[in-house]
Amino acid sequence: MGETIKCTFNLFEEGRQYTGHHRNYILESAIKACYAPETREGIRLREKLGYLGHGRREIARKLQLAEVEPVKLPDGSTIIVENIPSNITTFFEVNKDGIVEHHQEILETGPGKVVSGLNASKVGGFSWACGGQDGGAMGATRIVDFHGFDYVMNPGFAKN
């Protein structure tokens, strides 16, 4: 097994003033998604995978990725993209005060090695991949499901 990175952040304290998404999370929805039976089972079975960046999920237009995904290019052609994870969520909790704690086991894969190096250099951090309704800076953001934590260059929560 690879190294484990333990993170804690507060849903109501982004640690950013000028950058970030400034979302107003509905706490109850985050707690419900965290403790949903499918989330707990996915963590237990080591299926809540994370990737280097959100890009793979974005180009596939879905949060739950297969090992390979067909991706349609602007010219109409299709390519096959391999989705090699960098990390696995092994622990995930959200408490009534909005404190989120999660542990990420870094995988012995190419992307995992990049994540390990970036983290050791204090560049980037983890960002959760959740389905739901994004209210942006002015509305309420509701989480309905959890798919893992990706490693991104500018995480929404600076302490993550």
What are these regions (language model features)?
Residues M1-N160:
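Signature of dsDNA virion morphogenesis modules
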